[in-house]
Amino acid sequence: MPFRSNNPLTRDELLSRFFPQFHPVTTFNSGLSGGSFLIEHQGQRFVVRQPHDPDAPQSAFLRQYRALSQLPACIAPKPHLYLRDWMVVDYLPGEVKTYLPDTNELAGLLYYLHQQPRFGWRITLLPLLELYWQQSDPARRTVGWLRMLKRLRKAREPRLLRLSPLHMDVHAGNLVHSAPGLKLIDWEYAGDGDIALELAAVWVENTDQHRQLVNDYATRAKIYPAQLWRQVRRWFPWLLMLKAGWFEYRWRQTGDQQFIRLADDTWRQLLIKQ
């Protein structure tokens, strides 16, 4: 249910107006993007979310609501309310582990997602790379960063292998292991893009695990594994630049030292993978 309001509500106003019988249970502070909180009434639970990036346009938050509205409940939480600065979605019971599931199981989840109808908006990385450069701490902008940005701008994004709806933030903390199967949470970066971009973006532990995930996916998608891996590798510089830039951007927003450490680690990976 989308609900429009020009004035953002406080948490207490939101609950009293739309969920008067519910009460907050706990706050989730895990992850790099921010927290949300859980409300409950007689065993029914919802997650109340706010935009992770306070500087992002409201349209980005609305897109997340629209993505969740069209996704099947077997892979994503169903949304119940959207209004300015707030979204209420189903709570997904299950376990969030600290490591990725079996690569074949994860490949099955991603392949199923990629068979769904497209969202209707494209993921384009170059505008994000340029935004993160512009919004980063000037003291952190290096000649190497600018040189790599210009190189990618000139090269342009890799040609699409297959255009599908993507989650774009697949890591252990965003996977819920439930009785019916794996489900994904945190859909704020979702959009339509190349399936190889999604596979390149998965937060894997090592190259062997990454190769196995790509091989398992290729089997399901009836693509030659070597062909799919080559396409995944074409996206590596773009993804690493995206991660590094996002960490730099968040460092300037929050002053949280973890983002500097993550940015420095990603810059080192970028040098290795070039």
Swiss-Prot record:
Catalytic activity: thiamine + ATP = thiamine phosphate + ADP + H(+)
Cited InterPro entries: Aminoglycoside_PTrfase, Kinase-like_dom_sf, Thiamine_kinase
Pathway listed: Cofactor biosynthesis; thiamine diphosphate biosynthesis; thiamine phosphate from thiamine: step 1/1
Membrane-spanning residues: none
Biological process, per Gene Ontology: thiamine diphosphate biosynthetic process; thiamine metabolic process
Pfam family, one: APH
Gene3D superfamilies reported for this sequence: 3.90.1200.10
EC category name: transferase
UniProt-listed Enzyme Commission number(s): 2.7.1.89
Record GO terms (molecular function): ATP binding; thiamine kinase activity
Kinase recorded as keyword: yes
Keyword field contains GTP-binding: no
Keywords: ATP-binding, Kinase, Nucleotide-binding, Transferase
NCBIfam families according to UniProt: PRK10271.1, ycfN_thiK
Reported function: Catalyzes the ATP-dependent phosphorylation of thiamine to thiamine phosphate. Is involved in thiamine salvage.
Similarity section: Belongs to the thiamine kinase family.
HAMAP family per record: Thiamine_kinase (MF_01604)
The protein's name: Thiamine kinase
